[in-house]
Structure formats: C-alpha cells, structure tokens
A protein has these predicted regions:
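Conserved alpha/beta-hydrolase "acid-adjacent" motif
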Residues: 30-31, 160-166
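Serine-hydrolase catalytic machinery in alpha/beta-hydrolase-like enzymes
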Residues: 2-104
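Alpha/beta-hydrolase fold active-site loops
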Residues: 17, 149-150
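Active-site signature of alpha/beta-hydrolase-fold catalytic machinery across serine-
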Residues: 34, 119-123
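C-terminal catalytic histidine-bearing segment of alpha/beta-hydrolase fold enzymes
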Residues: 165-205
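A conserved short beta-strand
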Residues: 126-138
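Short beta-strand/loop motif that positions the catalytic acidic residue
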Residues: 152-159
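Gly/Ala-rich beta-loop-alpha elbow adjacent to hydrolase catalytic centers
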Residues: 108-113, 117
C-alpha cells in the first residue's frame, strides 16, 4: 500500500502493540513522528508509525486528509466520509503488517488527524482499542458508542482553531451514548501539543 509514512520505532521481535500517529493539515509524518518518539521508549514492543495525509495540502511538504478550504459545519462530515475508507484501509494495512489486532492498536491524532481518528471509530467501531485526540473534534457528534474503544480527549483551554467546546460536547455525547471517554484540558494552551498534553497522553496509555 502506497502512502506517506515515517516509522518511528520497529521492534526487533514481533510487535505487541501498534501506535499510529496522524498529523494536522499542512504537516507531515516526519514532524508528527517527533510526538511518536515520546511514546516509543515506554512501549519498546510497539510498532510506532506516523502516517501522512492522503493528499497534498498545497504546502510543498504538507499533507492532509481533506481540504479545509471553504469548510463549514454543514460540509465537514461529507469531506470526512469521502476519505474515510482510505483512512480505515490504512489502519488495517498496518495492523496486518504488524500482526497486531485492534485490541492492541492506538490511534493518536492532532487537529485534523484527531478528527479522522475519532471519526474512524464512529464509522468502524472496534477499529482500535484507544484513541488519543489532541485538539480535535467530531465532524458531527456520535449518537452511539462502544466501550471497546477508550477515547482520550486532550485539548488546549485556549485553542483558537478548534474550540474547547467541541471537546466538551464530544465527552458529553460519548458519556450519553455509554462510551468510555476522558477529557483533559491543558490550561492556557492554544492549538498545539506541549509537555503537559504529552504527560496526559502517556498517563492514559
């Protein structure tokens, strides 16, 4: 399967866990791989891969899963849905390559990468056992949820790009649907990942 990716860690013996990272619009898998390097030492038996978006973003080295040009609350879900089969296929490709099942797979995303990770579990329940969504949101809130996947929402309290209210609404929707979810708010943080965000993520994994 041909897609942009950067292998952060590949264990010598068969992998016991699979950690897949997904970047934001205009970023690339190598840059997001730096986030993966925080997880790798704590999970020496994990295959850790940073996956690039499916299409170029206009920025020379940047990738994206869907365009944000002219995006609205009304058309966001359709854009996510259009590329979702490719996203799910990518996750399944790495599960097959690693020999790791969904029960030991974690999807870790920032911004648009977090949107895709969250939406993938909505589209394909049980695709992974954990999602860590840094400064993400749902395109539209889930009406059903499964405890087969634990969702960890980590969000900057001062995010000007994806308002904290989206994470709060996601938590409330998942709880109402009977899902397994946590929300950690990083005070005074904008649309970014910092050491505090990472510590929340590491504590959950």
């Amino acid at each position: 399967m041909k897609h942009d990716h950067f292998v952060v860690q590949s264990p010598d013996k068969p992998a016991q866990q699979l950690l897949l990272l997904f970047h934001g619009v205009g970023d690339n898998p190598v840059a997001m791989g730096e986030i993966g390097s925080w997880f790798a030492p704590l999970f020496p038996d994990a295959l850790v891969v940073s996956v690039g978006g499916a299409e170029p973003s206009g920025n020379p080295a940047g990738r994206q899963w869907f365009s944000v040009q002219g995006i609205t609350e009304d058309n966001r879900q359709a854009r996510v849905d259009a590329i979702m089969p490719t996203f799910i296929e990518t996750v399944r490709y790495w599960q097959k390559q690693s020999g790791v099942g969904a029960n030991a797979t974690a999807l870790i995303g920032f911004s648009q990468g977090a949107i895709m990770a969250l939406e993938s579990i909505k589209a394909e329940p049980g695709l992974a056992s954990r999602v860590i969504a840094f400064n993400g949101r749902y395109a539209s809130l889930p009406e059903t949820a499964s405890t087969a996947t634990t969702i960890h929402l980590i969000h900057g309290g001062e995010d000007p790009v994806i308002d904290l209210a989206h994470a709060v609404a996601a938590q409330e929707a998942l709880i109402s649907a009977g899902g397994d979810v946590t929300l950690d708010i990083v005070e005074d943080l904008g649309h970014a990942i910092d050491n505090r965000s990472m510590q929340f993520a590491l504590d959950h994994l």
